[in-house]
Amino acid sequence: MPHAKTAMKAIAKKTKAKRQHTRMPDNSSSKEEVSSIEEDSSLKEESQLGVTETLVWDLPLRLFHWALSLSLVGSWVTAEAGFDWTETHFLFGYTALGLISFRLLWGLLGTAHARFSNFLTGPKAVINALGQLKQKTPPGEVSHVGHGPVGGWASVVLLALVLTQAVSGLFISDDIFYAGPYNSAVSSSLADYLGWLHHTNFNILLAAIALHLITITWYLLGKKENLIGPMLTGNKNISPSLAHRKTQSKTQPMTQPAVYSNPLWRGFLIASFVLVMIVLLVNLAPEPEYF
């Protein structure tokens, strides 16, 4: 009997131990879930703590962006509309050329985040930025104060494509109805080449614009970061970690407002200069040759 009692006690201990063992994962998993929820909520609170709304994109830059978008759409529509819209197509081309000229000057003389020196980086930074595209942006924050390494070079590529499109259009001709203002200034073979470039570059430009729109959509749906809103209002929510970074040129800390002075007078002067240059460019073109 003593042996039987001892055996019964041993069985009872093993059964109790098994019950405790089977219950432990449930308790630990529930604790892990709770701690994970608490950690996520604390990270969210920390990410929103100290976030300040800062004016990043100045008004001249925003006006340029949307005016260029309209001119590109207008150029495309009038090119497809036929001969009756040829003059309007050229007007959209001149507008695009003027806008690109303004942006190039604004990239040298404009406010902090409009300047090329503040967002054009080396290949290492671009590769690192590409690897971070899959990461979600913390709620209420942004990935970069101004252009990121990828976005900076993407904007330069788009500017180069639009510039190529506008300049080549000055020399093209269909040999029957219309000709660019400087068609007679070049040889027929060069004009033919520039005509080919104008049409080929347009397809490349369309692909680049499509990629641009896809990237914006990915940021909105994948990274949960709205890029369209700041280009309308100019404002971004800047976290403390981003606020203490330096610009690429290391001339202005991010703790200072991106638009540290009223840029409107400077933008107006540059826009006026560009307008005069475009008008002179068109009106001083050589007279077309007639046979």
Which residue ranges define each predicted feature?
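Membrane-embedded alpha-helical bundles that constitute the cytochrome b-like, heme-associated redox core
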Residues: 2-291
